[in-house]
């Protein structure tokens, strides 16, 4: 994902583009075919979040609260969605993730998953992996996404 800014050089009058990469990784959208009482977003807790004490919802699970931020417009509904079992499942998947990830569940049942891995879904790399290794990596990454989707099914 890139951000593109266009600007006009005063000296020449020509338009130029400045393109900056803001995200490199895999993402997936899944429609869960049901509505939810609120939206929620989970993303990694990082240095500045810890220093600034970003306002996030605490789940009561110390491991989850140390690793992730949770926001929603309805704290009680978000905590009903994120049951203790679901939180544990997310933590297990976090340990097997191939990059930092974020989850966004919308009221309309759209579940967005993004893993900042530094490469796209089917990037072959620079010849470092043979075809069997590539197939295994692709299957492992897709399995991680489907496992995370399964964690949110039947909420």
Label each region the model flagged:
Residues 1-155:
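Charged, low-complexity intrinsically disordered regions
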């Amino acid at each position: 994902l890139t951000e593109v800014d266009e600007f006009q050089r005063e000296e020449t009058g020509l338009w130029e583009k400045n393109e900056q990469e803001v995200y490199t990784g895999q993402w997936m959208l899944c429609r869960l075919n049901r509505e939810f009482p609120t939206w929620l977003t989970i993303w990694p807790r990082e240095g500045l979040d810890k220093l600034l004490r970003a306002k996030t919802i605490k789940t009561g699970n110390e491991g989850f609260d140390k690793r992730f931020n949770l926001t929603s417009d309805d704290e009680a509904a978000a905590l009903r969605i994120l049951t203790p079992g679901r939180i544990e499942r997310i933590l297990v998947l976090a340990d097997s993730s191939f990059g930092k990830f974020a989850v966004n569940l919308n009221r309309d049942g759209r579940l967005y998953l993004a893993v900042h891995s530094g490469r796209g879904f089917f990037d072959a790399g620079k010849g470092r992996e043979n075809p069997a290794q590539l197939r295994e990596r692709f299957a492992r990454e897709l399995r991680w996404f489907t496992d995370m989707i399964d964690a949110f099914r039947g909420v």
